[in-house]
Amino acid sequence: RDSYAVPYISGLVASDSFFALGYAHAQDRLWQMVFSRRMAQGRLSEILGRSALESDILMRTLNIYNLSQKAEKKQSEEINRLLLAYSNGVNTFINEISNSGLGRGSPEFFLYTSQVAPWRPTDSLALMKMMGLLSTNKAKIEILRTRLMLEELDGARLEDLFNEPPLINALETKEYNFFKTSLRPDKNFNESERMLLSQDYTESFLSNINLPASNIFAVGPTRSATGATIAANDPHGTFSAPANFMLVGMSYNSKAAIGATIPGIPAIIVGRNKNIGWGIANAYIDDQDLFVEKINPRNKFEYFTPSGVQKFEKTSEIINIKDENPISIDIRKTKNGPVLAYNIYGVDAVRPEGHEISLSWTGSEEKDRSIEAFISLMMSESIEAGRKNLPLLQVPSQNILLADKNNIGIFTAGAVPKRSRLHTTKGKIPSLGWQKNNGWLGFQLFEEKPFTQNPGSGIVINTNNKTTVREFPYHLSFDWGDSQRIVRATSLLQKRQYHTINSIVEIQNDTVSISAKILLPLLAKQLWFGHPQQFEKAITSQANNALDVLSEWNGDMNPNSPAPLIYASWIREFQKMVIADEVGDLYSNFRNIRPLFLERVLRSTNGASRWCNIKQTEELETCNDISKRALIKSIKPSAI
């Protein structure tokens, strides 16, 4: 290990190094690994109690662990050998702490004293599949869109919020009319299911629709001061202790690789070897669809399909709960996927009486060899070799950055559902499961997905931004990451003709918010040129001082400057005022700043300034009025 405790592993053959990787992961992160395994198995309630029940029900419903057991049999002989070697390394450390009196492996095990079960190859595959689940939000967005439509938000306002055209004549579709006439808020909930979960869905970690972001970019030999390629990646994970990633160096025979691993998964997810470097950015592929399944009123064990009535597949699961009696849950499955019961994802809000909601997800495949895609990158000697196994990636869907000595490229990988051109909702809201043309038709070929390699600009970049302008059903997604980062990063990369490692690091460490540079002048234009009398006397000086500070600000989110704090508080309050008035409790889904939405509102793109008129008042407010109120509230919360 070096001075930062990063392990460097050297083995004679690959299995030796993977054994040592398992040992090092367990040595440093055993609690993290065991906790993640419990989550994938749907067994967190055993140690955390009822508060983890929703997570356990979701994992059991999606069958994460059993699917991973089946996937183990689909791996190549070499991958299974490496998975077993890794598991043996983990278990060697577990045996040491269990049998040799060398402590418990982590302080948390003094609180949760249950015996640590041996690590199995299935465990690693389950963690990979769970990573795919936590990297998508499409089912939750379908539910949110539906609820917003039912709140009478018209197509133009949905376009403002999601920065994508709404469904054509969305308010006239079969699905909308069906939901509008069928949903009865007082009857949608299965009371016995609802009582099972003690926590409100809006307070659940599963309710968050926002995904972590990532940036990948590279310059080719023609844009490098040394004539070598330079690649960079900064995956933005959620804050956690310990961090999601663990840095490791590995070598065996004449091969070597170094980079970021996820404890429990025997692969370098982001890193480099002697010949290539690789990085990842979430591709935001629409990899989930919800279906409304109509229950046969004459037989509750059957549901309607396009070809007639069919029986639900049914299994039961026992979930043990700390300090409580175990519970039994019934899990049903349709041809479209498992039924989301127990208000998973808040689904009861869009589940009509006499119907269920099922989920199709690309991670539900048994033939999932995603882990091989990353392990093969560790051993690749060129872009072409690295690209060869990317079609194996099922979940999580990613834009993969590859760079060798002479080439750079970004390739979209991960399963993309094939949908019919006649799909009635295009996957934007739940579709009717008994209507033909709504079900999936398999998956797109890897060759059909977007990629860029050695462009004339000598630069490749992705910041979770839109990667294709193809129309449905070849569109990949309707929901993408923001577009501000791609603008800023492209500008910085184009600023220099030739880059060095230092200039790339400088871009990675850039703290200028292009969103702030765009939005602040729109937000403050009237106030900067107004008069002190427009503010209540008690806070005139504070408001004007804040405006003075912001007038000298260049958008740099420097933590030592007061300007970013003033701006962030102001813009957040402004967004809350204009959205919460329209959507009520659903505002919890819009707590993250939405720069494109705010720019549309402040510029009144297609009349979007109508958001500034507060429904709860009789007066007709403008965006200048709301901007002023938001500034006052952000400076002195009790003022309004």
Name every feature range the model reports, one short phrase each.
Residues 74-98, 222, 227, 235-238, ...:
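Structured, non-membrane catalytic/scaffold regions adjacent to prosthetic-group chemistry
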Residues 7, 11, 16-65, 279-330, ...:
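Gly/Pro-rich active-site capping loops and adjacent beta-alpha segments
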Residues 1-230, 235-238, 259, 573:
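Substrate-recognition/specificity elements adjacent to catalytic centers across diverse enzyme folds
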Residues 338-340, 349, 355, 393-496, ...:
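Hydrophobic alpha-helical segments
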Residues 68-77, 230, 366-376, 469-476, ...:
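Glycine- and acidic
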Residues 209-211, 215, 250-263, 267, ...:
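Glycine- and hydrophobic-rich flexible loops that cap the catalytic core of alpha/beta enzyme folds
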Residues 54, 63-66, 87-88, 372-397, ...:
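Proteins synthesized as precursors that undergo proteolytic processing into mature forms
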Residues 565-640:
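Charged, long alpha-helical assembly modules
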